[in-house]
A protein has these predicted regions:
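Conserved beta-strand/loop scaffold segments within soluble protein domains that form the structured core
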Residues: 58-60, 66-203
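N-terminal amphipathic, basic helical "cap/leader" segment at the start of enzyme domains
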Residues: 1-104
Length: 203
């Protein structure tokens, strides 16, 4: 069973955030392939983020997308930077810590995740994608995805999640909050590849 006394709630990866894919650890690259996300598709994405355990290790967004005012960044950067007020307005308002015990746990120990804002009237014709790999044995991953699609805008967002198989329990307790304003459209897709030792308790 799941014993929280044996789950590490924060594991720092042994690499820093990278903006060049060739600098990302090989096992993350290999897992992208196993998830069925080929090189050609990655090149056609509007932006890609990759989290390894508790922190993002890779993030990149196309200049043309950023030029339209689209914000795609990691949650830590968003809440510490110029988007802090927007994050505070929406963070854990759809899913509150009072919903259930795993929502409360997530609210207490969350780390990593993606923040996306698409301005009014902006239509992204190619998707943004975030990938979350829980690599540490006996650990939990608590990423938070917050997406706001403003009036008349549109977005396709893809998330992928996976972890190695271990003989001890791991926990994935991420949270996704999606705000779609009047006349806006959001297509949200998730690809998950878990083994039997993983407790996947997303909210």
């Amino acid at each position: 069973g799941l014993d929280m006394d044996h789950i590490a709630t924060y594991v720092r990866p042994n690499t820093k955030m990278r903006n060049d894919w060739k600098d990302v650890p090989e096992d993350i690259k290999e897992t992208f392939e196993r998830l069925g996300i080929p090189q050609a598709e990655r090149k056609s994405l509007a932006g890609v983020g990759a989290q390894y355990d508790s922190e993002l290790v890779y993030h990149n967004v196309k200049d043309s997308v950023a030029a339209e005012g689209v914000v795609y960044t990691d949650m830590e950067s968003a809440i510490k930077g110029e988007y802090a007020d927007m994050v505070r307005k929406y963070f854990m308002k759809l899913v509150t810590p009072h919903d259930h015990k795993f929502a409360a746990l997530h609210g207490a120990v969350w780390s990593g995740g993606s923040f996306v804002y698409v301005p009014k009237g902006v239509h992204l014709s190619i998707p943004l994608q975030s990938y979350f790999r829980l690599n540490a044995k006996g650990a939990g991953q608590f990423e938070h995805t917050l997406i706001i699609v403003d009036e008349g805008a549109s977005l396709h967002f893809i998330e992928g999640c996976s972890a190695p198989k271990y003989n001890v329990a791991n926990l994935h307790a991420g949270c996704v909050e999606l705000y779609v304003k009047k006349g806006a459209k959001l297509r949200y897709s998730t690809i998950e590849n878990w083994s039997k030792n993983m407790y996947n308790l997303n909210t």
